[in-house]
């Protein structure tokens, strides 16, 4: 809206005054009038605001102009006062562009003025400071400023050129160059200065020539008496010329006098002095020369005295004492004294080192500073000391190595030596070489003698005492050879006697055991009959005494074999837990009789299947545990097995067994005696507890043979702990369903009652049982199992003792063997195991081999009981030459209802086999006419010849019977084709178990043979039989060649068997093993 335009009412309407004066119009137009007035008032108010804004804007513009004018005035005043540092401030927002332009122009002017002033000031300052050549820079200035700058630069340039020219000439004059003059253009006073300087240079050149001529003649050429001739000189130059000439004259007189004195001094005449009249410094020179002459006299006297003392009289340590000398003379004096001091130190150091060398001390060297020939002498002496030290070191080393340490063949390595030292070194090396040859020759002969070769003698050359020693050694060898021959004859006689002793013991054993076996057998049979109490007691005493005597005989035979070094150990596969468990089961009855707890614990982490001698391990455990039971009245006997902490080879394991008891203990002073032969802790113990004292001695020797050691800790009255270690190897044996021990039980049932194992663990165990050819039935509680027909279990596996107790309350499974399997089996109480019928145990998780090792003993004990039915009658052939043993065996067998035919030697047994068919043969090893081994070989050959395709059909089990306990009889009997082994005295239960097992196993194999014959079994049997050639061959090999290992019999009734499959043939193998492999193939 335009503020000058006034609001008006519509032309058709009345005016405001009309409306206000007319009430009627007022009432009609009141509202519109009010609106019109409001619009008018608002318009006026807007006009007022606009005017006020314009007024304020004008005031601000005036104020800004005044401020800018003030700032410009301040800058102008500063310029007038010579201050060019200030500028007009330019604000961020400038209201007037013209003012802004003025400010920029003024500031630019200030910059140019400041630059001009700085440049001109710089040039003026440089010229004032003597720095010529400077110029003022002109950066775009014009007008008067540019002209002023150019004039200043011209002035500076001219002044620079003139001053530099003058400076060059004066500098040349100062340096003695009088050939240059000033030739630069100059005007005014500068020109006058130029001419004056050039004139001065000419005069100086003439003066210098004349003065130089005089100086050269007098001072250089030594031509005295010359004068300087200079013309046209005045003032100072003339005076200077006169003074020079006077100086030359005086100098001539004085110098000639001084020359006379110095010439006399040079000729060694120190009596003359300078006498010319002198002044000033020449006088000082005169006095100095005269003083020099005096000092030279003193110096010559002192040096002469020192030289005579050091050089002639050999008195070291002297010094030249010259007073009041300075400069070169003082230096000469000091040098002379230094020479005397150095010479003294050097000679004394050389004397010290040579004295030390003379006294044998080669560690010192000349370390004093020296030069020239003295240095060469020093180096020569030090080199001599080094050579002597090397010589002494090498010679001492040879002497010490050869003479003290006994190191032969050493030579002194000394280089760079000549003369006597080289000769001595050569002599020492010759001595060492000769001594080496002689001693090594002596050593070779003594070494040969040590190795048993007494045919060689010392032939090396020697002299003196070495020759006497050589003779003595040769004589000693000769004497030793004779002694050895005598000792050899004596040893052979001793070995013959020892062999006779061993054979005597064997024969004695046989002769004693034969009637003793009869006594034991007959008393056992009598004890099984109706007897009175008195008769039973008497026969029991006889039976016990006979068994004790038999044990003593076995111990004596064992210690005899050990002493004769004929005792060896086997390396066969065996089950550790089964071996120890079986041994402790045989001792459990004795422990129960004495009301003792017999416990057993084996480290679950230790492997079960090992390679070693299980029979000897069992023997040691029986011995130690039996002793513990014997010497313990109350408490318990514990056997623990773990891995030893001692280090062995990587391929070996060290087994540690501890047998502890709460018995009588052993006194500390007796601990070292108990392992000696025929010794116990004291004699009273022998009388109270019985025994021969051989058990621990035999155990110690057996443990040593098995690579271990035995020790004991004991507290008297509280008990003992016997520890021993045995070195074994882990076994790689693999059980399958075709393994010999498992073949007879193929597809038999196994019940597993588990409350501790998870389902996953049970699945693994089920697969293992199936892999062994058995049928598992796994239940979580006894109620889920079918305990009646048609399922018939051979063994029952359990994982807790509580389950075993419940099973023994059930009549259906009361006599079935139990196998305990658990993650971590605590100590086993053998009383509980016997009462519950636990046959074996295993730790889980376990391998197939560990599982088979636990199952097989239970299966075999179950099969024996199943095959011991009295309704079964066997036809048995007994080959025995002793009448008592015949009657004993016949009574035992007939009592079981079996039919027995008796023959007296092996030949009769062979003929009987050819005539009749027998279920089993009991073959005595030693018989007249033909022994048991020879008879067995002939029987096996006849069986093979009778049916070369399938000799197994005609195979008759043969069980060896012997009272001979010497080493190798068992192995030999098995290797000859016998199926099992029974040691006398005959125990009815063990004998019947062995008979039943052999007959059962051979019947099972014959059945498998018949079932497999349709698959070309006979051809494969013939082809795979070792030694066979063709089906029609006369020597096609025997079934014995396919025989493996038969379990070794326990020597105590009730011990059971510990059968193991053997995967390699050796001298100890000889039973049914590979037949199963032939059937499988």
UniProtKB/Swiss-Prot annotation:
It comes from Candida albicans (strain SC5314 / ATCC MYA-2876). The phosphorelay mechanism involves the sequential transfer of a phosphate group from His-510 (H1) in the histidine kinase domain (transmitter domain) to Asp-924 (D1) of the response regulatory domain (receiver domain). This transfer probably occurs between two NIK1 molecules, rather than intramolecularly. Pfam families: HAMP, HAMP_2, HATPase_c, HisKA, Response_reg. The modification 4-aspartylphosphate is found at residue 924. This is Histidine protein kinase NIK1. It comes from the Eukaryota. The HAMP domains are critical for the sensitivity to fungicides such as fludioxonil, as well as for activation of HOG1. Residues 875-999 form the Response regulatory domain. Keywords: ATP-binding, Cell wall biogenesis/degradation, Cytoplasm, Kinase, Nucleotide-binding, Phosphoprotein, Repeat, Transferase, Two-component regulatory system, Virulence. Residues 63-118, 157-209, 249-301, 341-393, 433-485 form the HAMP domain. Its EC number is 2.7.13.3. Residues 507-730 form the Histidine kinase domain. Induction: Expression is increased in opaque cells.
């Amino acid at each position: 809206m335009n503020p000058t335009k006034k609001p008006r009412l519509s032309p058709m309407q009345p005016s405001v005054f009309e409306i206000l004066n007319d009430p009627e119009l007022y009432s009609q137009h009141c509202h519109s009038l009010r609106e019109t007035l409001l619009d008018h008032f608002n318009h006026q108010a807007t006009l007022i605001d606009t005017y006020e804004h314009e007024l304020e804007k004008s005031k601000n513009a005036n104020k800004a102009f005044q401020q800018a004018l003030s700032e410009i005035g301040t800058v102008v005043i500063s310029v007038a006062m010579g201050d060019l540092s200030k500028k007009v401030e330019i604000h961020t927002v400038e209201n007037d562009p013209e003012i802004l332009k003025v400010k920029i122009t003024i500031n630019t002017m200030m910059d140019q003025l400041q630059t001009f002033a700085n440049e001109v000031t710089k040039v003026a300052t440089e010229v004032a400071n003597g720095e010529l050549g400077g110029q003022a820079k002109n950066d775009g200035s014009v007008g008067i400023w540019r002209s002023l700058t150019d004039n200043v630069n011209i002035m500076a340039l001219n002044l620079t050129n003139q001053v530099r020219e003058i400076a060059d000439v004066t500098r040349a004059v100062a340096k003695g160059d009088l050939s240059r003059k000033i030739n630069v253009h100059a005007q005014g006073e500068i020109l006058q200065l130029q001419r004056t300087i050039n004139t001065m240079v000419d005069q100086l050149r003439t003066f210098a020539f004349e003065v130089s001529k005089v100086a050269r003649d007098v001072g250089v050429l030594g031509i005295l008496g010359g004068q300087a001739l200079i013309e046209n000189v005045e003032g100072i130059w003339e005076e200077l010329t006169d003074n020079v000439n006077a100086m030359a004259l005086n100098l001539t007189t004085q110098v000639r006098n001084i020359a006379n004195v110095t010439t006399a001094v040079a000729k060694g005449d120190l009596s003359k002095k300078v006498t010319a009249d002198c002044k000033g410094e020449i006088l000082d020179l005169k006095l100095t020369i005269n003083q020099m002459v005096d000092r030279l006299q003193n110096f010559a006297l002192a040096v002469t005295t020192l030289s005579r003392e050091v050089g002639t009289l050999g008195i070291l340590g002297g010094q030249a004492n010259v007073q009041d000398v300075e400069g070169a003379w003082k230096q000469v004096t000091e040098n002379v004294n230094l020479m005397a001091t150095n010479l003294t130190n050097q000679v004394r150091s050389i004397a010290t080192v040579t004295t030390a060398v003379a006294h044998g001390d080669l560690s010192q060297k000349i370390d004093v500073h020296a030069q020239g020939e003295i240095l060469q002498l020093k180096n020569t002496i030090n080199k001599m000391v080094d050579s002597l030290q090397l010589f002494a070191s090498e010679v001492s080393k040879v002497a010490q190595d050869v003479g003290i340490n006994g190191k032969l063949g050493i030579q002194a390595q000394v280089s760079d030596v000549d003369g006597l030292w080289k000769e001595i070194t050569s002599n020492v090396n010759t001595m060492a070489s000769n001594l080496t040859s002689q001693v090594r020759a002596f050593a070779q002969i003594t070494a040969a003698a040590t190795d048993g070769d007494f045919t060689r003698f010392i032939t090396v050359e020697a002299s003196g005492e070495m020759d006497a020693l050589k003779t003595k050694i040769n004589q000693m060898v000769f004497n030793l050879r004779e002694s050895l021959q005598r000792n050899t004859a004596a040893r052979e006689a001793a070995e013959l006697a020892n062999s006779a002793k061993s054979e005597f013991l064997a024969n004695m054993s046989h002769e004693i055991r034969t009637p003793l076996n009869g006594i034991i057998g007959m008393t056992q049979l009598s004890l099984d009959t109706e007897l009175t109490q008195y008769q039973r007691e008497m026969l029991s005493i006889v039976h016990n005494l006979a068994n004790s005597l038999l044990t003593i005989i076995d111990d004596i035979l064992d210690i005899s074999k050990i002493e004769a070094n004929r005792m060896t150990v086997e390396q066969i596969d065996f089950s550790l837990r089964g071996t120890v468990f079986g041994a402790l089961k045989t001792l459990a009855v004795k422990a129960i009789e004495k009301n003792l707890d017999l416990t057993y614990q084996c480290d679950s982490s230790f492997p079960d299947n090992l390679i070693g001698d299980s029979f000897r391990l069992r023997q040691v455990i029986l011995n130690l545990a039996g002793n513990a039971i014997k010497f313990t009245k109350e408490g318990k006997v514990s056997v623990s097995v773990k891995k030893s902490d001692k280090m062995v080879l990587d391929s070996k394991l060290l087994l540690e067994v501890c047998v502890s008891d709460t018995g009588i203990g052993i006194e500390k002073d007796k601990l070292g005696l108990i392992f000696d032969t025929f010794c116990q802790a004291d004699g009273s113990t022998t009388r109270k507890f019985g025994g021969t004292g051989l058990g621990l001695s035999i155990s110690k020797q057996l443990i040593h043979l098995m690579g271990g050691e035995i020790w004991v800790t004991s507290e008297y009255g509280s008990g003992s702990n016997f520890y021993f270690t045995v070195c074994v190897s882990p076994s790689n044996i693999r059980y399958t369903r075709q393994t010999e021990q498992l073949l007879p039980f193929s597809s038999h049932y196994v019940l597993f009652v588990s409350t501790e194992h998870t389902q996953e663990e049970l699945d693994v165990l089920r697969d293992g049982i199936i892999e062994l050819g058995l049928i598992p039935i796994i239940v979580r509680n006894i109620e889920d199992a079918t305990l009646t027909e048609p399922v018939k279990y051979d063994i029952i596996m359990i994982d807790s003792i509580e389950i075993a107790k419940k099973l023994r309350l059930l009549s259906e499974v009361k006599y079935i063997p139990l196998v305990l399997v658990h993650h971590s089996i605590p100590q086993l109480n053998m009383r509980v195991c016997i009462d519950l019928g636990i046959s074996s145990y295993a730790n889980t998780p376990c391998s197939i081999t560990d599982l088979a090792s636990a199952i097989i003993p239970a299966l075999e004990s179950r099969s024996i009981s199943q095959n011991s039915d009295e309704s079964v009658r066997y036809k048995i052939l007994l080959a025995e030459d002793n009448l008592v043993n015949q009657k004993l065996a016949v009574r035992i067998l007939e009592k079981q209802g079996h039919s027995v035919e008796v023959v007296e030697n092996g030949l009769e047994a062979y003929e009987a086999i050819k005539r009749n068919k027998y279920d089993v043969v009991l073959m005595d090893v030693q018989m007249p006419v033909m022994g048991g081994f020879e008879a067995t070989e002939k029987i096996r050959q006849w069986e093979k010849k009778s049916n070369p395709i399938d000799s197994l059909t005609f195979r008759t089990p043969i069980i060896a019977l012997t009272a001979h306990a010497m080493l190798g009889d068992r192995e030999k009997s098995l290797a000859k084709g016998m199926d099992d082994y029974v040691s006398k005295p005959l125990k009815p239960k063990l004998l019947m178990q062995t008979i039943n097992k052999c007959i059962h196993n051979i019947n099972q194999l014959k059945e498998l043979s018949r079932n497999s014959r349709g698959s070309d079994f006979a051809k494969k049997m013939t082809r795979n039989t070792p030694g066979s050639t063709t089906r029609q061959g006369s020597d096609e090999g025997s079934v014995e060649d396919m025989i493996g290992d038969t379990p070794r019999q326990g020597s105590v009734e009730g011990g059971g068997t510990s059968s193991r499959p053997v995967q390699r043939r050796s001298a100890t193998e000889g039973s049914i093993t590979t037949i199963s492999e032939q059937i499988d193939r």
